[in-house]
Amino acid sequence: MQPEVPLGSGKLKPCSDMGDIQRAAKFRSSQSAHMLLLLLASITMLLCVRGAHGRPTEEDEELVLPSLERARGHDSTTLLRLDAFGQQLHLKLQPDSGFLAPGFTLQTVGRSPGSEAQHLDPTGDLAHCFYSGTVNGDPSSAAALSLCEGVRGAFYLQGEEFFIQPAPAVATERLVPAEPKEESIAPPRFHILRRRRRGSGGAKCGVMDEETLPTSNSGRESQNTPDQWPLRNPTPQGAGKPTGPGSIRKKRFVSSPRYVETMLVADQSMADFHGSGLKHYLLTLFSVAARFYKHPSIRNSISLVVVKILVIYEEQKGPEVTSNAALTLRNFCSWQKQHNSPSDRDPEHYDTAILFTRQDLCGSHTCDTLGMADVGTVCDPSRSCSVIEDDGLQAAFTTAHELGHVFNMPHDDAKHCASFNGVSGDSHLMASMLSSLDHSQPWSPCSAYMVTSFLDNGHGECLMDKPQNPIKLPSDLPGTLYDANRQCQFTFGEESTHCPDAASTCSTLWCTGTSGGLLVCQTKHFPWADGTSCGEGKWCVSGKCVNKTDMKHFATPVHGSWGPWGPWGDCSRTCGGGVQYTMRECDNPVPKNGGKYCEGKRVRYRSCNIEDCPDNNGKTFREEQCEAHNEFSKASFGNEPTVEWTPKYAGVSPKDRCKLTCEAKGIGYFFVLQPKVVDGTPCSPDSTSVCVQGQCVKAGCDRIIDSKKKFDKCGVCGGNGSTCKKISGTVTSTRPGYHDIVTIPAGATNIEVKHRNPRGSRNNGSFLAIRAADGTYILNGNFTLSTLEQDLTYKGTVLRYSGSSAALERIRSFSPLKEPLTIQVLMVGHALRPKIKYTYFMKKKTEPFNAIPTFSEWVIEEWGECSKTCGSGWQRRVVECRDINGHPASECAKEVKPASTRPCADLPCPRWQVGDWSPCSKTCGKGYKKRTLKCLSHDGGVLSNESCDPLKKPKHYIDFCILTQCS
């Protein structure tokens, strides 16, 4: 859980330094919805913090008369001119409401929708209000404005931020662009334009301690540990020997458009404070956040959209909101589930929910918390939620920041990020202390990497569906809607006004307040809202005062395109089958001005260095990785001075096979020592699939990814099963104690020993045991039993044991046995006569069959393929009599002639099995019934339907039914 901590009380300075102050009139409910939309539009430019120590910013303001006109030849382009601060600011604006879903709805809790519709949205549909663009043609500038009820919003130009809003006397009037036939309009409506420059002060973001110790089976594992492949293409040196074609996965490492369908919730404190302007205010905040997530520095195509806004008018009908931020988050996460449709096809289904409140939130130590969210929960319906404290337009920063946590981003100063960010400053959105936002790269390399890895590992599948009817987000800059005075009121209360300070124009908002009975200026070190006027023809954009005429240079979106593939990187292993990568960047060109990010494969990978590794005392590669942690395990378990780690396979979920789960030898505790094994590590002992970036991908027995080659029953890669023979037997015993059943020689493959208890009994007093060649016991020796399923690693061979308490006690192994083992049965008490069956396969001898050694001999060729894959087939081979020179002969003894045919594929074929009929779908009239259809192997395992004979597939597994005629 990530609590967000601001700067505390903010920074103060004597009022004598602030010059003449004009107190803004109260700006109430008719504007608040509009304000909320603008605030949302600015979220991507804000952070989750609110107080810091830093130098003051420069800030001043002027009264201006905005002039709007349609651009000639461009029906959708609107030109806004502002004369302020001794310059002309020309804004070239385009409608921009992409953050609103077409099917966006506004709902209320505690009042009827009909009675509140007009109160919440007196201006009707707000989607047409919002615009974005550039200032004075500067491609590095940015603007986000609303042109409804006057000009409101913010813009950024050349290091200065501008915020514009109607002067209080005209706050409820409406300013709209002229019709296309009219060249311009300039109604005599004064606006307050504020300009601000950001200082070097920082905003602090506190987090709970992030555990990175090994995670036990009873603990909760962190999801934000970095992966192993680099952000940039590595150098080709030591790349390893590539093997086979490049493996390009269908879903892994693919840049796909993601749509974050969002529900915005405002509690009663928000409704009381913002009144009818609440909806617009929320959407303004969200539109700013949406623009941040469109920035190419996030290295993904992520669109934030609103599908629903819910306003709570009766406190008791909403989630319990208290000063305890963590408890409020838990309450909200639990409460919001009732408002979400379980079907992703529902237009009102949302992927994440955000609660906005005016309640002062507190963390575990201070009340400087501005927001809270869990990490990496975006597709978890129960935990994909955030809580935001609304303290003004800067709440947009908090929203972008908290959504970053939901997308699995840690803070930039977390140790996970050290290898990515290096000596990183605090100028990115996920910084724990923000000094100044780098608008050219709002997301740090670590943030981009963490969200990319998170999505590549399948944690964002709920974001793949494009919303049907998103609500349009406002395009107006927030500073055009809310002047500096109003921004101060949002942050410090209704009595606060803007403190003019030429040194902090656009960069830091200073507001009046009282301290010790004295009138002072105070700040929370956030810039003026974009769009706040900072001079004649200028306004604030991204903390800088820019000319409005430069808007044209960055108003046109530039869509990104992929650059060339880079060189192949280093192989993850020096032998035994590793993985190497090549990457490409979305830099040809880099997307700009809200242009689309590249879609398609960003990473390719392939197998490399597949040669056998030198013998390492029979240890597997996973064993080596577990043992590498022995020297770091200083904690004692019981009386043991240190811990020896061995791989754990039994009981590990299939989705966790590529985590390094190791067991403390002789103790039984197991932990996830690493979130991912090294690329190329086999997923399990009985599979040739390998791990790639924490995911199990198919590979052949030749260690090549996507290869179809398999081991046959003889353990030969790509073989046909003709080089070995099956050895089996059944043993019974009645004497107490340990008794040998069979000694399985080295080289045996596909070993299976089964001990079935009598029907209705879980144990009959007899148990399997394994003894090594040196007489030591590997399993169930010295009358000590292992009751649970486990994996036994012996000389590089993994033996899987079911546990003595299983109804079918079983020992299995698939790889060739390195040393002989003796299978025993332990009889205790008055045990019933056990029935134990064993099977394994051994390589055939290849000596020639000689009839007359000195003159001629029978010469045989390899067995051909079996005529069937199951159900009893035949194999043939050529058997010829030849002399010592290899010529055909007839002197061979016929009585010793080897057989030229033999039966094969003696295992029963997979069979179809149908289940019982389901109840009729209707209680009367004509309905239908169905039954399950499965393809089963000879031992009862479920196979894919393709494994069974399609000609024998039952045809009637769905049928009509009539229980009774309807009356």
From Swiss-Prot:
Prodomain positions: 55-252
Any one GO biological process: positive regulation of vascular associated smooth muscle cell migration
EC number: 3.4.24.-
Organism: Rattus norvegicus (Rat)
Record bears the keyword Zinc: yes
Cofactor(s) needed for function: Zn(2+)
Gene field: Adamts1
Enzyme class: hydrolase
Bias-annotated ranges (Polar residues): 213-227
Entry domain remark: The spacer domain and the TSP type-1 domains are important for a tight interaction with the extracellular matrix.
The entry's keywords: Calcium, Cleavage on pair of basic residues, Disulfide bond, Extracellular matrix, Glycoprotein, Heparin-binding, Hydrolase, Metal-binding, Metalloprotease, Protease, Repeat, Secreted, Signal, Zinc, Zymogen
Domain TSP type-1: 559-614, 854-910, 911-967
GO MF annotations, alphabetized: heparin binding; metalloendopeptidase activity; zinc ion binding
Residues annotated as binding Zn(2+): C205, H401, H405, H411
Protein modification: The precursor is cleaved by a furin endopeptidase.
Protein name: A disintegrin and metalloproteinase with thrombospondin motifs 1
Function description: Metalloprotease which cleaves aggrecan, a cartilage proteoglycan, at the '1683-Glu-|-Leu-1684' site (within the chondroitin sulfate attachment domain), and may be involved in its turnover. Also cleaves COMP. Has angiogenic inhibitor activity. May play a critical role in follicular rupture.
Residues that hold Ca(2+) 2 according to the record: E261, D344, D465
SUPFAM superfamilies found in the cross-reference section: Metalloproteases ('zincins'), catalytic domain, TSP-1 type 1 repeat
One Pfam family linked to the record: ADAMTS_spacer1
Cofactor note: Binds 1 zinc ion per subunit.
One GO cellular component, as annotated: extracellular matrix
Catalytic residues (positions): E402
Carbohydrate attachment residues: N547, N720, N764, N782, N945
